[in-house]
Amino acid sequence: MSTATAQPAKKTPQKLTWLNIVGYGSGDLANNIGWRMMSMFLATYYIYIGIDPVVTANIFLFARFFQAVVYLLAGNYADRVKPNKNGKFRRLVVMFGVPMMVAITLMYTIPTDIDMALKITWAIVTYLLYQLLGALGGVPYGALLGAMTQDQNERQRLSSARMVGGALFGLIATFTLAPAINTVTDQAALAKLMLPVVAIFCLVGALIYVFLYKTTIEQIDVPEQPKVSFVDTLKAIVQNPALLILCFATGFYLIATCVGSIGPIIAKEVLANGADAGTLALITTLVTLINASIGVVASPFGPVIARYLGKKGGWYLGCALGIIGGVMFIFVGNVWLSLVALALNAIGAQFCGNYVWGMEGDTVEYYEWKTGKRTDGAAMAGLSFFRQMFGALTSWLGPAILAFTGYKAGMNVAQDPSVAENLRLAAGLVPLIGFVISAAIMYFYPVTEEKFKQIKAELAERHAAAEA
């Protein structure tokens, strides 16, 4: 006589509460403490404490390449961790997020009176530590969304909450540090400004990670994804011309955003050169605000534009706005119009960014239509890897521009009169070139809206025939 073993019924996932959604969104506020403090202020901080712009650029380049490798390893690590009764992603976020806050604080503790070699070593070690912990915590944070719910409306709410959380810290940092960073008079004063503020931010960030752990839930078993080797990733890119075009077009629009990391220096040396302290603080705040937040304001218009112009047309519009902004910044000397030019650059980049992941999905369908094979994982890995590589180059370019224009490191260092003119030219020309190349590459992108309709219809016929 055989006895059947009763299988426990699977628990029906509960609806997410507003606290679950707020808890998840708050996590990206904490994540952005590191990202925003790096992208908005770290290059300026390094250079103001005397680290040469070329050295600063190379630190950024090496660290971002390091981060790209760590992200690949972090994904494998997260897959191998076994869940307990409370899941696994939340505890990984806290496990690495809290130490990351310590690493961020340490980045801004470089003593001003030590040997330059020690300053550089301190900068490298603490920045790499931040990149390591940020990747190890960032991967499970992204995966947590899928483990919380399968409902598409709830997932959209979680994504929106994440965007709000990230943008919120950009605003906080802008109005806290931007007005003051260009008004301090020496390195000691800079340290007294940065360290207490950053330490408070990071303490709050650590508490936010604990809040996330307490308020989020993991109730969906995320199936193990097939491992994608580096060779598979390269094949998916090289054999898929649509994906290859998207990767390079994305890379060059990212390059067009490179001046954001040196925004406070652009404000001081170009837009408010010789101005009083109040005007300098105002201009620095506005430049930082534009780089940090105006793209988020423009983001909701992306789907509307795509509805009328298509994603490819929306990309062209973004590049056109960036090109206009670059030309304006080079030739228009008026401070307020220069700020408009920077805003056009930021809006243009956001419009391009709006379409990247949707177009990535289209390239998967295109490749299946051409070859009969689907490469979802490899395509995502390939695009992400390209973004990391071009992101490294973008991080390098900001400080490198300062070096190429003859800017001297340090605080209140008398700059050659040609520096302001050279900076204006470079800060307009480099983004302009990035947008021009991005638009030129996108011209060859084969998946228009009409073509995609044809691809979907033919794939549907193939799938139906295969199931018959």
Predicted regions and their residues:
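Membrane-embedded alpha-helical bundles of multi-pass transporters/translocases
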Residues: 2-468
